Amino acid sequence: MRIIIDLVPNHTSDEHPWFIESRSSREDPKRDWYIWRDPAPDGGPPNNWLSYFGGPAWTLDEASGQYYLHQFVTQQPELNYRCPEVLPAMLEVMRFWLDKGVDGFRVDVIWLMLKDEQFRDNPPNPDWDGVDPKRSLLPVHTQNLPGVHELIKQMRNVIDEYDDRMMVGEIYLPNEDLMNYCGEK
């Protein structure tokens, strides 16, 4: 029997020690491990990014006065892979489980791990049918960004440190984009 576990590198729980530390103050060393932004001039979310489950992808943290990003539920804040400390920490999580004997990972929402550095609004979707609000915008600044393949390559390098292990990513993209995620191994 082989054991494959779900790895969720895009976000953590809001109860995870990393996020609790990040949330504790703007000066905390782990603050940059998550995506925090000041409010827009009107006090609202920093941009128009939407949650997959409805509404804005941002929640205001009253204590710090900044918003944190969550493309799913508010209890799943997004890690900031532009922070140089985050990827090595996640690679250590992978090694922890591989050392325990798991045979590989199904990597959740792997194509969402990087976000636009400038936090630009996603443009309106001209083909939106008015049904699913999440589809009202084209997610050009929130998914499948340049650089995500390098993150995946570094994750694959960890897998290659072990014999007979595997990794597969959950990716919902058009076929022409999806093919760019197929590796040689």
Segments the model singles out, each with a brief description of its role:
Residues 1-95, 99, 111-174:
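Acidic/aromatic-lined carbohydrate-recognition and catalytic surfaces
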Residues 171-185:
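Noncatalytic carbohydrate-binding groove/subsite architecture in carbohydrate-active enzymes
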Residues 105-107:
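Hydrophobic residues within beta-strands of alpha/beta enzymes
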